[in-house]
Amino acid sequence: MSVNQMQIEDVYAVLNSIHGQVTGNADMVAINTSNFVSVANTMLQQNTDAVYSALMNTITKTIFSTRPYSRQFGGLIVDNLKWGGIIRKIQFGDTDAVADEAFHNIVDGQSVDHYIVNKGDVLETRYYGSTVYQDVMTVFRDQLVNAFSGPEQLGSFIAAKANEVNNKWTQWTEDLARGLVINAIVAKREQYDGWQEHPGQVLHLISMYNDETRSSITINDIKAGASAKPFWEYVRAKIRTVQRMLASRNTYGMMQINGHNIVRHTPYSRQKVYLLAPYMDLMETSTLSEAFHNDMLQYADYEGVAYWQAIREQNNDYPLDRVRASTYVYLDIETGKYRNANIGEEVPFVDHVLGLIFDEDFTSINIKDTIVQNTPMNARGLYFNTWLSAHASYLQDFTEKCCVLLLD
């Protein structure tokens, strides 16, 4: 079933399915407009509550089964099978090789012990908890009766309600995913920026460019003028370098819990690249855009993001490349536990965010336990309610690779 429109034959199929559910009789079916009205009237007269419940269940089940996530950050959604392998993660750290030349120094009358124990470095992390999403839609009896007055009306009603459910679901999951991205940017900048033991946490691209080229450009210089083209060529090269570093087995862009020598690599096919679209537009007009997209981005999950957090603030001073968070979650590498950092009232901005490149296991969301419940008709108000409920579980694993790119 299309979310935007329905063919007449699809409407007949829906009506016949509802008729079978409500009456338990599959003999009387709708095959034309006249027959459609007869079947619809029979159902409504017999049990209006059951008709409404069957109709809404049909609509919502179609939406949830197809999951058309045409929204930003869609790559962060994982299914139950993938999530089951994430909530309890077993990781193995590198241990030093044993310097042993016993086989070169065999001595008569002595044995060589080959039962020496090396238990290895094993790290187990667990992720718990979920949040509940719940929303309600109200449909009046007059709307339901009008919907069953003909196949075109029912098709329009189904398409409208399907769009309503899909839009609510899409917006909710996008907001959750956006929150995870914002948390990653703020936590990386506040907690891990500048760690020499673990490079690649945050790259300050303008400062790096000025240091390497002995220039003194600012954020305004990269938008137009003579400095724009060489700078964006530099950024394009740095993005390729970051992707190559993430693909190599090292500690670039990740944190290690003390006492555990976990080393990772992220193949290009498992990299996610989220970059701010307005800046990407500048890059494409300043460099060979086709060559850029034919680089390593073609192998990664690349997405141009319209804005990071909001399109405007109350004082109209909220650029598209700015994020802020009054609290964020980060990994305490001393204890291996996650902590909440309350910044307080003076919430710092993270300005000029170009984007982030990360492993697909760095952050994700799982939507589960989707439930649709319909109320009987309200006897006084003559309306029905449909409640949509679901649980959302999400994680952010700072022992996985993630590099934040800032234009400062």
Role assignments for model-derived ranges:
Residues 1-66, 288-408:
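Extended, compositionally biased alpha-helical segments that mediate assembly or anchoring
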Residues 31, 69-76, 174, 186, ...:
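Short glycine-rich, low-complexity/disordered patches
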Residues 68-69, 167-178, 248, 395, ...:
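Intrinsically disordered or highly flexible coil/loop and linker segments, enriched in small
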Residues 190-323:
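Extended, solvent-exposed, turn-rich assembly/linker loops in the middle of proteins
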